[in-house]
Regions:
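Short, His- and charge-rich active-site/binding loops that engage polyanionic ligands
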Residues: 29, 33-34, 40, 47, ...
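Conserved Nudix-box catalytic region and its N-terminal flanking loop in Nudix hydrolases
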Residues: 26-70, 147-166
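NUDIX/MutT-family hydrolases
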Residues: 98, 108-142, 146, 155-163, ...
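N-terminal strand-loop-strand
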Residues: 2-43
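Active-site segment of metal-dependent pyrophosphate-handling enzymes
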Residues: 11-15, 58-61, 65-108, 123, ...
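Short helix-coil junctions and helix-kink-helix linkers
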Residues: 167-176
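Long, intrinsically disordered, low-complexity Ser/Thr/Pro-rich regulatory/activation regions
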Residues: 196-225
Length: 225
């Protein structure tokens, strides 16, 4: 029996992941070289098709785990990209997500197997299809949300210096922050806690290490840096 569904065209649905990391003062993006056509050998975001019995959210989590080995990662849906000719291979509608990961925690063997590499956000090579638009939109969303919620801590190690914290937000916003004002704002946030540990990698004197107390933040969810 012909049904309403049978008489309408069917499309592929995929997910693409914009994976952000932070290292040495730079916001970075994890990219891979495609090993299949179309656009074989070109730089691309990590993606995959949504499988039977799988939600788009679950598909994005699976794709991220397949590339990095990480689970329970902060992810946010960026939007749906569905131009008719966006993929020259087939009609594919893609749902894009951005993810924030600690760059020291991912599975390097998996990343190597996928021929993936980190690129600095301001030095991204040409990307396939509409992936540049996905990255641009994801970065705008990241900047907006990072200004009002403490999502940036997902990019930092559990213990960090104030220099690292300021460098992170400078990388996210794409502009320098006044050191004095930044330190003053940190002092006003009781959920950024100073520990008794010292980081001596930069100097003999060292720098105090801080941590983000999520429970304290949830009691008074106010953030600005």
């Amino acid at each position: 029996m012909t049904t309403y569904y049978n008489i309408n065209p069917r499309f592929y649905v995929s997910v693409d992941c914009i994976i952000f990391g932070f290292d040495k003062g730079s916001l970075k993006l994890l990219l891979l070289k495609r090993n299949f056509e179309p656009a074989k050998g070109s730089w691309s975001l990590m993606g995959g098709f949504v499988q039977d019995g799988e939600s788009v959210d679950d598909a994005a989590k699976r794709v991220l785990a397949e590339l990095t080995g990480l689970e329970n990662v902060y992810m946010e849906q960026v939007g749906t990209f569905g131009e008719v000719d966006r993929d020259p291979g087939e009609r594919v509608i893609s749902v894009a997500y951005y993810a924030l990961i600690n760059i020291n925690e991912y599975d390097r063997n998996l990343v190597q197997q996928h021929n993936a590499h980190w690129a600095e956000i301001n030095e991204i090579p040409p990307l396939v299809f509409d992936h540049p638009q996905m990255v641009k939109q994801a970065r705008i969303m990241l900047q907006k949300k990072a200004s009002s919620e403490p999502i940036g801590f997902n990019l930092l190690p559990s213990l960090f210096t104030l220099f690292q914290l300021q460098s992170l937000y400078e990388a996210i916003y794409g502009e320098p922050l006044d050191k004095r004002n930044c330190r003053k704002r940190v002092a006003d946030l009781n959920y950024i806690e100073k520990t008794d540990k010292i980081d001596k990698t930069g100097s003999k004197r060292g720098a105090a290490l801080y941590k983000f107390n999520e429970n304290a933040y949830r009691k008074a969810p106010k953030f600005k840096l």
